[in-house]
């Protein structure tokens, strides 16, 4: 049984904690928070042992009436691995100043740079490379989604060139500080966006073959990708079959009511998913087309949750708990109740 510590019980951290708690080969030994907010209170109510991420703030939790077991320093030595859920740039600082200092394995999230860790993780592409490693970066929600669809396409044809336009959500639903509210923003205005190089950090064979551009639009529900991939040769039926066989990809039909990201999220709600999470990415079947061996399709990414099962698989890889990535994926999916 692997002892997992969640450092940063926020948007990603709380989801990873719940996912780990559902596995039969790992357990959450504690979670940390920097301030005594409602998430800290709910962590305790869920039965997680709560620790102050910043020792000097421990008294704030006590004054707020939220019981804490101690500080990060009090629990980190008991962890086999730490999943870092800190905001962008803080993960790198934690890696250098905390995890390496204590000699504990750690996963940092996709807001950090590829060079900040030993490798970049995706369950389908880099499980073997990350096996037994000490410090790994779990790539972002967009990169995770692109890696899944590239895997499906690559399973039936060689990828010669990939062009992707990313339509990114402006902010998460709980974020009141980020926009835009009434604009479409190139993000970045330069091409390529960081997403292409990030995919290459997972799939080196796409170096020089992938180009991405991105814009932000006023929505909070999901990202969307418009994908165009030149291949060595395939057809629509092969691509649809490959998508159906690839873990954590759902094919949806606009003709069945899935005519927007709002309807996809409504589907997640109707499934009874916690926080309406959709760990799988959704590809519109009608959007799949192949013209002169070039694949076209559109997919939607739930930015808060598609990386969650990958974190669980990454734990198994780094702790050498399962050598077969597909077996880990199957085990994780079953525990989380994923469709595929």
UniProtKB/Swiss-Prot annotation:
A Pfam family recorded for this sequence: DapB_N
Keyword NAD assigned: yes
NCBIfam families: GAPDH-II_archae, PRK04207.1
Cellular component GO terms, alphabetical: cytoplasm
Active site positions, chain numbering: 141 (nucleophile)
Residues at which NAD(+) binds: 11-12, 111, 169, 303
Cited Gene3D superfamilies: Dihydrodipicolinate Reductase, domain 2 (3.30.360.10), NAD(P)-binding Rossmann-like Domain (3.40.50.720)
Self-association and partners: Homotetramer.
Example GO biological process: lysine biosynthetic process via diaminopimelate
Gene label: gap
Reactions listed under catalytic activity: D-glyceraldehyde 3-phosphate + phosphate + NADP(+) = (2R)-3-phospho-glyceroyl phosphate + NADPH + H(+); D-glyceraldehyde 3-phosphate + phosphate + NAD(+) = (2R)-3-phospho-glyceroyl phosphate + NADH + H(+)
Chain residues that bind D-glyceraldehyde 3-phosphate: 140-142, 195-196
Metabolic or biological pathway, per its Swiss-Prot or TrEMBL entry: Carbohydrate degradation; glycolysis; pyruvate from D-glyceraldehyde 3-phosphate: step 1/5
Subcellular location: Cytoplasm
Protein name per Swiss-Prot or TrEMBL: Glyceraldehyde-3-phosphate dehydrogenase
Record EC number: 1.2.1.59
Keyword field: Cytoplasm, Glycolysis, NAD, NADP, Oxidoreductase
Cysteine pairings via disulfide bonds: none
InterPro entries reported for this sequence: DapB_N, GlycerAld/Erythrose_P_DH, GlycerAld_3-P_DH_AS, GlycerAld_3-P_DH_cat, GlycerAld_3-P_DH_NAD(P)-bd, Glyceraldehyde-3-P_DH_2_arc, NAD(P)-bd_dom_sf
Predominant location category: cytoplasm
Domain of life: Archaea
GO-annotated molecular function: 4-hydroxy-tetrahydrodipicolinate reductase; glyceraldehyde-3-phosphate dehydrogenase (NAD+) (phosphorylating) activity; glyceraldehyde-3-phosphate dehydrogenase (NADP+) (phosphorylating) activity; NAD binding; NADP binding
UniProt keyword annotation of Cytoplasm present: yes
Protein family (similarity comment): Belongs to the glyceraldehyde-3-phosphate dehydrogenase family.
């Amino acid at each position: 049984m692997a002892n997992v510590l969640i450092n940063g019980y926020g948007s990603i951290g709380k989801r990873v904690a719940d996912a780990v708690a559902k596995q039969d080969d790992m357990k959450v030994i504690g979670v940390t928070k920097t301030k005594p907010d409602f998430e800290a209170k709910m962590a305790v109510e869920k039965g997680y042992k709560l620790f102050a991420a910043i020792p000097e703030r421990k008294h704030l939790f006590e004054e707020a009436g939220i019981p804490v077991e101690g500080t990060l320093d009090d629990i980190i030595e008991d962890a086999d691995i730490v999943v870092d859920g800190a905001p962008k740039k803080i993960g790198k600082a934690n890696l250098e100043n905390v995890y390496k200092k204590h000699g504990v394995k750690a996963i940092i999230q996709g807001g950090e740079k590829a060079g900040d860790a030993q490798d970049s993780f995706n369950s389908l592409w880099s499980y073997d490379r990350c096996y037994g490693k000490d410090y790994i970066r779990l790539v972002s929600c967009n990169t995770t989604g692109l890696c899944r669809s590239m895997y499906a396409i690559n399973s039936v044809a060689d990828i010669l060139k990939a062009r992707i336009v990313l339509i990114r959500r402006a902010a998460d639903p709980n974020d009141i500080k980020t926009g835009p509210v009434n604009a479409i923003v190139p993000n970045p205005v330069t091409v390529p966006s960081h997403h292409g190089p990030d995919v290459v950090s997972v799939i080196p064979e796409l170096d020089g073959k992938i180009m991405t551009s991105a814009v932000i639009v006023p929505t909070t529900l999901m990202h969307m990708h418009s994908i165009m991939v030149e291949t060595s040769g395939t057809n629509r039926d092969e691509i649809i079959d490959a998508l159906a066989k690839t873990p954590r990809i759902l094919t949806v039909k606009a003709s069945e009511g899935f005519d927007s990201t709002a309807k996809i999220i409504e589907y997640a709600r109707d499934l009874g998913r916690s926080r309406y999470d959709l760990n799988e990415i959704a590809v519109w079947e009608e959007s799949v087309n192949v013209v002169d061996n070039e694949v076209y399709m559109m997919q939607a990414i739930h930015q808060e949750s598609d990386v969650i099962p990958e974190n669980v698989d990454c734990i198994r890889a780094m702790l050498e708990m399962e050598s077969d990535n597909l077996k880990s994926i199957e085990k994780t999916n079953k525990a989380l109740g994923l469709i595929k």
